[in-house]
C-alpha cells in the first residue's frame, strides 16, 4: 500500500534529504582531510590517530541513523546540525593547513636575485623626477661588469644624459659631491658602503631620483641531507640590511650560525661580527668584511663562514628588515632587558637600562641595530641581536603562541624570508615540537677580533674598519659548535 503523504511525513522526507546532503558533504570533507593529514605529516601520532578515529566513528553514527527505519525528525535534524558543524570544523582545519603549505611553498630559494642601481642627486637638487634629467651631467665609473653596463643601457633608454665617466667609484662620487656633475649612477649596495666609509659623502643627504632593477639568474643553494628531528645541524641566519623584496642583493649585517642538537634540545648561537675580516670563498689577495660577502650572494656568505670556522652549514635562513618587524609584530612583541638607556625618535623607541621591556617589531629592529650608544658598538650589537633571536625562539616554541598566532606568523613572513630547508623537514620539526613540546636550552658565543683599518677586496682603494681575526676565538667557536653537535 502506498504511504499517504502527511505533513509529518513530508517534513521527515525533507529532513532526511537534507541529512543525506549534509552527510555527503561531511564524508567528502573528512576523506580529503584525512588524505591531507597523511600527505603532510604535521600532526604527531597522538593527535593524528584520535582525529581519524573520531572522523570514522562520526561517519558510522551518521550512517546508522540515516538508514535506520522510523528515525525521528529531531534525530535527522540533529544529524544535519552535527554534520554541518563538523564539516565547518574540518574546513577551519583546512584553513590552517592551507596557510602552512602555502607558506612553505613561498619561502623556497629563489633562482634569481635583484640588483638595484641608483641615480643619486643632492638633496637640494632642482630635479624632482627622472624625466627632467635629459641633458644633465651624470657621473659613471669604469665598472665593466655586464650588470652595470646593462643597467646603464636601461637608464639611457629612458633619458639622454651627458655621461661623464670616471676611472673608479671614488672619482664618480667625488664628482657629484664637488658639484662637477648633477648626479651619479651607482650600484645601490655600493652607495650604502660608500656612505659608511667616505667622510665627504652621506647618502642621507642625497635623493634617489630613479632606480634601475635587474633580475639576475642564479643557482639555488642546495640543502644538506639531514633529518632535523634526529640529526644535529647548522643553520646560517643571514640578515640583510634592506627592506622590500627578499631577493634583493645587499650586505649581510647579521651572521649567526644556529647549531641545533634535537637529541639534547640544545641550541648554540654563534655570531660572527659584520666587520670581521675574512677571505671571501674562492678569492685570493685582499681580505674583506664578512658583511660584503652578502653582495655576492647567500652562497658566498655560507662558504666563507664554512671556510672560517671549518664547519658544514646544512641550511640557511635569509631575512631582511621587513622580516624582523613583521615576525615580532605577529608574535605580539617580545621582552628584552636593555643594558643601556637611549631613545630613538624614528620609531619613538625608549630603552631603559635594567628594565625588562615589551618591544614591537620596529623597536626590536632598532634595538638589534643600535651601536652608537655603546663603547664597543659593533661587538655590543651582537649581544643585542642574540637577545632578540633568543626572545623570538622562546616565544615561538611556546604552545600558546603557536596556537593563537599561527596564521599571522606565517602570513607575516611569506614574502620576506627565504630558506633552503625542505618543506618535509619543517613538517617533521613541527610534528616533533607539538608532540614533545621540549624546552630548548639556548647558549651564546661570538668570535672576537681586533680593530684595524685596511683595504678590502670590495673597496680596494680605501682603508676600511675591520675586526682582525683572533685565531684562538675562531678555534673556540669551532670547538663549541662541534661539541654541541656531537652530544648524544
Q: What function would you assign to each model-found segment?
A:
Residues 90-109:
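Hydrophobic alpha-helical transmembrane segments in integral membrane proteins
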Residues 8-19, 72-75:
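Membrane-interface helix-boundary signature
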Residues 1-7:
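Short, Lys/Arg-rich, polar N-terminal cytosolic tail immediately upstream
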Residues 14-65:
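Membrane-embedded alpha-helical segments of integral membrane proteins
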Residues 105-115, 121-123, 129-488:
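Non-catalytic, solvent-exposed segments at the cell envelope interface
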Residues 73-96:
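Internal/C-terminal transmembrane anchor helices
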Residues 64-73:
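Cytoplasmic membrane-interface regions of multi-pass membrane proteins
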